[in-house]
Structures are given as C-alpha cells and as structure tokens.
C-alpha cells in the first residue's frame, strides 16, 4: 500500500504544480514568447480539437521531468502540441521523444512545429502507422503517452507494456470524456497486477497514469 500511496501522492503534487503554473505566468514553468506563439498557432488551427489542453500539456511536461524519463514515446502526435510539452520535459530530464503520427499532413505539421518551438533536437516525429513503426524502435520506454484512436488503446497497451521499463509510466488521454470508447483498456489498466493506476483530470478530458511496479506481479497485487 505504501508504494501506491507514494505514487498517487506524486501524481497529485504534479497536478497541483501544473495548476499553479497555469495560473501564474511568471512561474519557473513560464514559456518563452516563441514557444507560446507556436502553441497558440497550433490551437488556432486545431479545428478537429485533436490537441490536448494547455493544462494537460503542462502536466505531461512535469511528469516527464519528475520521472527523469530518458526514452519517451508518443502515440498520436497530431500537429505537435503535446509533443512540444513532452519535449520541454525531456530537455529537463535529459531524455528524447519519439512521436508517431499516422496522418501525413499532421506529421509534417508536427515536425515543423517542434522545430519552430526549439525542441527539434529532443523530439523526433515519425510519419506512419504506429502498429508498424513501434516494433522498429530499439530499446525500452520510460514514459509512453497515448492519444490515438480510442478503440485501439487496448491494442497499443498490449504492444507497448512489455517494453515499458520497471518504474515506467504509461499515460493515456481522454479517459474521462471518451471513456465509453476504451472500456477494455480501462478495465485492463485498473486491474493489471503489475500496475498502479490513477485517473487525473487537469482539464475535463482526463488522463490515466499507470506506474509499472518494480515488484513481481504476485507481490505487486498485494499493494
């Protein structure tokens, strides 16, 4: 139970920091005018409402930094809004982000936007089907952010979980406002014996945050 309480406490603190930073533009988490300009432009052009909220973006940044994540995978990059936030966190953690986007136009936009925001050195955008591209990537992942087609969430989790490092974090978007589209996934992460999962909602969309325990499954379930 101690590990679970610690994990939830960390997530709550991260969410609180995000809330304070969003309310205080002079905080240490403030963005440069160039980054703010790029993020505003993405939002203005986001007619399909594919980008995460600013609050969710800030949450991702702090989570990457707090986890000291070195290898970060984003599944569903859209036009690069969340990738920029992940990249800002990766700059602080010394990590690298691989962001995969299926749609060719959005993938081009994402690559251009991360470059304009100044995080192109830590964020690599790949255009293609994530189911085909993920097996090509080497190594393991410290943090995975999933924001793709919701009925595919369970399939993506099954593919990526074996490559999530012990102590790694799996984050999924829209688990509150689109929960009916991903019920098999939600059942899995909430009952998995090797995960500690909590749901947070910096905005109304909601994110699941699942920590892969370092304990064997038969011991982790006793948490």
State where each predicted segment sits.
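Bacterial N-terminal signal peptides
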Residues: 8-19
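A short alpha-helical cap/connector motif
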Residues: 2, 6, 20-145, 150-171, ...
């Amino acid at each position: 139970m101690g590990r679970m309480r610690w994990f939830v406490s960390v997530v709550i603190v991260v969410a609180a920091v995000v809330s304070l930073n969003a309310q205080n533009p002079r905080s240490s988490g403030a963005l440069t005018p160039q980054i703010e300009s790029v993020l505003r432009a993405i939002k203005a052009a986001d007619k399909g409402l594919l980008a995460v909220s600013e609050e969710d973006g800030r949450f991702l940044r702090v989570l990457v930094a707090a986890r000291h994540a070195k290898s970060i995978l984003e599944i569903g990059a859209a036009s690069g809004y969340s990738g920029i936030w992940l990249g800002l966190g990766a700059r602080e953690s010394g990590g690298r982000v691989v962001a995969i986007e299926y749609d060719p136009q959005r993938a081009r936009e994402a690559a251009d936007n991360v470059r304009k925001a100044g995080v192109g050195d830590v964020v690599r955008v790949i255009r293609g089907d994530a189911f085909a591209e993920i097996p090509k990537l080497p190594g393991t992942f410290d943090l995975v952010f999933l924001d793709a087609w919701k009925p595919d969430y369970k399939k993506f989790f099954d593919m990526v979980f074996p490559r999530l490092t012990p102590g790694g974090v799996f984050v999924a978007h829209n688990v509150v406002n689109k929960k009916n589209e991903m019920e098999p996934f939600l059942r899995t992460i909430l009952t998995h014996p090797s995960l500690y999962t909590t749901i947070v909602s910096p905005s109304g969309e909601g994110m699941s945050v699942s920590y892969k325990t370092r304990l064997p499954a038969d011991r982790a379930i006793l948490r």
